[in-house]
Amino acid sequence: MASAQSFYNQSSVLKINVMVVDDDHVFLDIMSRMLQHSKYRVIAVDDPKKALSTLKIQRDNIDLIITDYYMPGMNGLQLKKQITQEFGNLPVLVMSSDTNKEEESLSCGAMGFIPKPIHPTDLTKIYQFALSNKRNGKSTLSTEQNHKDADVSVPQQITLVPEQADVLKTKRKNCSFKSDSRTVNSTNGSCVSTDGSRKNRKRKPNGGPSDDGESMSQPAKKKKIQWTDSLHDLFLQAIRHIGLDKAVPKKILAFMSVPYLTRENVASHLQKYRIFLRRVAEQGLYSMLSDRGIDSMFRQTHIKEPYFNYYTPSTSWYDTRLNNRSFYSKPVHGFGQSKLLSTTREPVCFNQMPYNYMNRSSTYEPHRIGSGSNLTLPIQSNLSFPNQPSQNEERRSFFEPPVMANKIAQTSQVLGFGQLGPSAISGHNFNNNMTSRYGSLIPSQPGPSHFSYGMQSFLNNENVTYNPQPPANATTQPNLDELPQLENLNLYNDFGNTSELPYNISNFQFDDNKHQQGEADPTKFELPAAKFSTELNHEDDGDWTFVNINQGQSNGETSNTIASPETNTPILNINHNQNQGQDVPEFNDWSFLDPQELVDDDFMNSLFNNDMN
């Protein structure tokens, strides 16, 4: 029996057109009434061949086909295959009281399986299959006017009846879906999907039907930004320009001006950079980043002011014989050095570094001699000799730089000891331009300039001659009153027996206005107790006056020549060959004098004043 049933509700509400095919007339009538009660439009057919004929006529008015599995002449699966060949992919549901046919039905392309008897809850499953087919554009809306059918195109917005609004939405099941993913509820006969059915759902490609019937186009995946070294350097420049505390992705992006960068890229990189800095701070590696660093692309991104070590000595500027000289010393006059070394040709560049960076040692204790003296007396604690280890890690200068107003000193690197004029050294030109810049000494001429070498030259009694070129009518009187008495100076034991002198030379005075026309009477005396001899020689050479004082020990002789030049620009000559061409004056023997008389100040003053005049 084939008859067209009218709608239960005659209003023009969206209807689902369902064709029911079953050879059992009783079940076909019950099924049709249930669907009509749920606002379906039902076409009931009792033969598979009639169903094919009806489809040829009302193909566009049928949204879903429900067929029984067991039918004479053609079973439900054969009907499904024939419909697919002739009319395309129409949704077909298979009904059967034999639940073993579920797997076979699904594997052959059926959209679903409904076990008999039908339960009202199964009607919702029927609706979801039909609605999915309608949204694919294959269904029509039928409105009954005067009991006649009219085809109307389905609008995009579908209005659902209240009974169909709460229907769940599922996908089309694959043909290879297994029966163990579904269980049959024996109480109500309904087929309930397990958790595995939802997990096995696959997302359909773009443009195809989805869960809610709408094509869901996935957004294109953003291209990953590769932070190269140049791009990272630009990022660091932006950080330095803006400041780490005020750096935000918007400002950094504006500073970098890279077209393909986004705020998300910069924000992600900035977050990684701050995490890197936090990790560095926790490990306490800020001081080691310049050498070792952390294995990261942020290895050069710790932001701080550049550190300049102005105080690291560079031994490449010096000869190896200068190892014991302080690199932080200032240019100073030697101990006992007179003002005869003053010149106006080249200035003394004192150390321009602040004292708070110099790491001055507590053992550096200068002792001033006199109120107007430019000399500084060293103490034993801050004298460094080869055989005596220094108390400090860094060797310091022996003397504090003299405070001189408009005075210019040109001295050698040797800090002389017990000098009244130039330092007594050998093999080194005294006109050695020496300046101190930024805490280090830069000699312009190589040579032995060690303090110990100067003292060794003093003890070895090497002959040195001082030959200036003074202009006429010039007088220079060294301030000898400010010289300390050497008997109070106790040096290290390596100096030998030179810590005490048998006479006081503080009253030496030179009068250069009086020139001697002939050779002065030479005087010679010898002190056996002190094991040294002193030779005084007054020598006339034009407008020059020389005083030779020779002090000797058993191991050698040392000659200090003191002159009173009449010029402001003295020239120091330490050429031994020059002394050979000069006449050697004769000396008188002073050995008959009493050593106690030599110690007497009045006797020595009268003796030297008479010789000078």
From Swiss-Prot:
One of its GO terms (molecular function) is DNA binding. A motif (Nuclear localization signal) lies at residues 221-224. Pfam families: Response_reg. It is found in: Nucleus. Signal peptide: none annotated. Transmembrane segments: none annotated. One of its GO terms (biological process) is cytokinin-activated signaling pathway. Disruption phenotype: No visible phenotype. GO terms for cellular component: nucleus. The modification 4-aspartylphosphate is found at D68. Two-component system major event consists of a His-to-Asp phosphorelay between a sensor histidine kinase (HK) and a response regulator (RR). In plants, the His-to-Asp phosphorelay involves an additional intermediate named Histidine-containing phosphotransfer protein (HPt). This multistep phosphorelay consists of a His-Asp-His-Asp sequential transfer of a phosphate group between first a His and an Asp of the HK protein, followed by the transfer to a conserved His of the HPt protein and finally the transfer to an Asp in the receiver domain of the RR protein. Residues 224-274 bind DNA. Residues 17-131 form the Response regulatory domain. Keywords: Activator, Cytokinin signaling pathway, DNA-binding, Nucleus, Phosphoprotein, Transcription, Transcription regulation, Two-component regulatory system. Mainly expressed in siliques. Also found in germinating seedlings, stems, flowers and roots, but not in rosette leaves. Residues 178-195 have a biased composition (Polar residues). Putative transcriptional activator that binds specifically to the DNA sequence 5'-[AG]GATT-3'. Functions as a response regulator involved in His-to-Asp phosphorelay signal transduction system. Phosphorylation of the Asp residue in the receiver domain activates the ability of the protein to promote the transcription of target genes. Could directly activate some type-A response regulators in response to cytokinins. Belongs to the ARR family. Type-B subfamily. Binds the target DNA as a monomer. This is Putative two-component response regulator ARR21. The gene is ARR21.
